[in-house]
Amino acid sequence: EKILAKVGLAPEHAERYPHQFSGGQRQRVGIARALIMNPKLIIADECISALDVSIQAQVVNLMKDIQQETGTAYLFIAHDLSMVKYISDRIGVLHLGHLLETGTTEEIFEHPIHPYTRSLLSAIPLPNPVVEKRRVAESYDCAASGIDYSKGTSHHVEGSHYVKCTDEEFARWCK
């Protein structure tokens, strides 16, 4: 009952069947199930992608509250970088199973290096419609880019910010 209360569910929710829950309630049940084991790490793979924006915010706020209360770490896997920015201290950008760029949330958002990272960030809608209308979105086509993920090494950008690429790509992207 304590765990259910912690995630915002009433004790009677323990007697319900999965089809009787809303999407947000299902996520809360999933979080409660994970918390019962008192984990040091929770892997949350696309845990909010199927929820509407207001419910996403509620679930992410709940996760942040639990993290502050328990010290639990999250590996938060998502395509929605605006939510990733809100919940994460550090970000790793993966594409086709390759870790392309890592750094603090600030480093990645303020100075993205890899073209794939830049394309993901340019897909985040801006709240100012005038700025949004003028912005040119970056697209990324791995095949057309000529980038071979199997080549290259980890290049230090600054602080804890690294990007995996060849020396030539690093020089070109950091101009």
Q: Where would I find each of the regions flagged by the language model?
A:
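Conserved ABC ATPase "signature" region
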Residues: E1-E12, L121
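A short, proline-enriched helix->beta-strand linker immediately N-terminal to the Walker B motif
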Residues: I36-K40
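Hydrophobic anchor residue at the start of the ABC signature
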Residues: I31, I43, V59
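Conserved ABC ATPase signature
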Residues: Y17-F21, Q25
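A short, surface-exposed alpha-helical micro-motif characterized by mixed small hydrophobic
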Residues: V84-Y86
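Short catalytic/signature loops enriched in Gly
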Residues: T105-K175
